[in-house]
């Protein structure tokens, strides 16, 4: 069973409170989402494997640790997921970036896939799927399905979001029990329009200044 973790680091919680405030404008919202994403990358990558390597310092030879195992690919769910990419690559600059485009039917609340572009070696990588909001879980489930259709395995996937609703967490866990889920905040519920309560509004609109 994959893990579900609410990242309670004080800086993450402080910055999440900042972007919940409806008075925060696009510039500060975008910058703070990037900062939270960098902090989340630290936590999401915590269990990446290490191996021993020989290093010669200016003083002596020594055995130290470096990353081993699979290289990373960051997969934002468009469009809002783009807001988390720069923060993630601050810590993992060599990561490749893939893209999965989704839009939500405002009547049915169902997601529709319109674009997929992934690195050629995607099946050989550890995948960090990012989307600021995990609401109904529909987009996350569809994104994971798209990756599985292309040969990726659940055990190599981690999903990271800023805010999650219990309904979305349940949907992903039931569909893909081996996918780890990380969130900065677990909120109360969804409202009748499918928005997270209390949430932070429409993350895409607030990131890009659209309506």
Curated annotation (Swiss-Prot):
List of residues binding 5-phospho-alpha-D-ribose 1-diphosphate: 79, 104, 131-139, 202
Required co-factors: Mg(2+)
Entry's family note: Belongs to the UPRTase family.
Protein name stated in the entry: Uracil phosphoribosyltransferase
Function: Catalyzes the conversion of uracil and 5-phospho-alpha-D-ribose 1-diphosphate (PRPP) to UMP and diphosphate.
GO MF term list: GTP binding; magnesium ion binding; uracil phosphoribosyltransferase activity
Catalysed reaction, written as an equation: UMP + diphosphate = 5-phospho-alpha-D-ribose 1-diphosphate + uracil
Source domain of life: Bacteria
